Amino acid sequence: MLDIKFLRTNFEEVKAKLQHRGEDLTDFGRFEELDTRRRELLVQTEELKSKRNEVSQQISVLKREKKDAESLILEMREVGEKVKDLDNELRTVEEDLERLMLSIPNIPHESAPVGETEDDNVVARTWGEVKEFAFEPKPHWDLATDLGILDFERAGKVTGSRFVFYKGAGARLERALISFMLDLHTDEHGYEEVLPPYMVNRASMTGTGQLPKFEEDAFRIESEDYFLIPTAEVPVTNMHRDEILNKEQLPIRYAAFSSCFRSEAGSAGRDTRGLIRQHQFNKVELVKFVKPEDSYEELEKLXNDAERVLQLLELPYRVMSMCTGDLGFTAAKKYDIEVWIPSYGTYREISSCSNFEAFQARRANIRFRREPNGKPEHVHTLNGSGLAIGRTVAAILENYQQEDGTIIIPEVLRPYMGGKTVIK
C-alpha cells in the first residue's frame, strides 16, 4: 500500500510512474475525489460534535437553573441525526478509499527498466555454459517416467492435473535439495530457519498483497476463510504484522521451506506437462526485514544468495532485471533468475527476488524504531525464492542426463543422497 499523504501531495507524479506499469488507472482517478470527501466529512463531523458538546453544557446549566431547555434539546436531536448520517457516509467513503488504496500497485524504482512486457526485461548477467549434447536431450517428464522416479499419471488419478508423486530416488532428490538449500542459507548466508503454517487468514494474504486483487489465484478453505499459502512469503512476512521492531533487530533474515499452492487460474494450456507449473510444489523462500536505507544493498545480496544455489549445482542461468510492466503488483524492483532447461531450449524462471520497499510493511503495519522513544517507521521487506524445488529437479534431470537415460547427481548433492552418484 502506498503512503496516502505522499499520494495526496504527489498525485500526478505517482500517476505518471504507475502508467509505466501499463496498469488500468481508471479507478485511480477516484483517489482525489474520495480523499477530499473524506477530509470534508471529518471536518463537518468534528464541527457538529464540538457544537453538540457546547450545547450539551448549556442544557445542563439550564436544567440546573430549572429553566426551559426544550428548544436546545430539539436542536441537539437534529444535530445527532446529522452526525449519525455523516458518520455513516464517512464509513462508506473510508471503506471505498481503503479498497482503492489496496488495489493500487507499488511505484517502480527509478532503476527498473521502463517497458511493457517480458520482452522489455534486461539481462543483468549470465553464469555457466549451456551444455551441448551429443544426442537429442529428453524432457524431464520423459526421463523421470522412464526411471520411475516421478508419477504424473497416478497423481492425476488421485487428485487431478498439475500434481505429481515423487518416488524412490526422485523423492530422495527433492528432499536432498531442500536440505542442501536450507543448510546453505542458514550456515553460510546467515538466515534463520523457519517452518511456517501452510494455511493463513485473510489479513495475512492482504498484508503481503495477494488480496484482494488476486483472490482467484488462491486456494481458499471456505469453512474457515483460510487460504493455502501460495508461497512462504505470506506467513513469514506476517510473523511481524502489527509489530514495532527495534533497530538492533534489523536486518532480520528468514529461510523457510514450505509447500506452495496455486490455482494457476491464468495459465490454462501453458506448461501442461512436467514440473514447471504445478498446483502444489515445494520451495525454499528467503524473507528479509531491513531498514529503508539498506534495502537495495540487501536486494543485491538476496539475488546473490539465490544464485549461489545454482552455482554450486553447476546449472547455467541468467539474471533478468524486470521492466516496469513485468514487475508484478507489489515489487518496486525485481530480479528473475532463470535456469537453462534444454527441452525448452531456453531459460525458465526459478527464482524471483523482489524489494517491496514499505509497500507490504504499510499493509501489514510492520514498523521499527531507530531510538527507544522515536517515532515508528515502516521497515522495508524483501523476498526471493532460494529456490523453487520442483523446477530445480527439472533442471538437474535435463542438464545432467546421459544418453542412456541415467542422471548424474550433482557433486554437492551426493552427501545428501547417501553417496549415490547416478540415478538409474
From Swiss-Prot:
It catalyses: tRNA(Ser) + L-serine + ATP = L-seryl-tRNA(Ser) + AMP + diphosphate + H(+); tRNA(Sec) + L-serine + ATP = L-seryl-tRNA(Sec) + AMP + diphosphate + H(+). CDD domains: SerRS_core (cd00770). It comes from the Bacteria. Coiled coil: none annotated. Catalyzes the attachment of serine to tRNA(Ser). Is also able to aminoacylate tRNA(Sec) with serine, to form the misacylated tRNA L-seryl-tRNA(Sec), which will be further converted into selenocysteinyl-tRNA(Sec). Belongs to the class-II aminoacyl-tRNA synthetase family. Type-1 seryl-tRNA synthetase subfamily. This is Serine--tRNA ligase. The gene is serS.
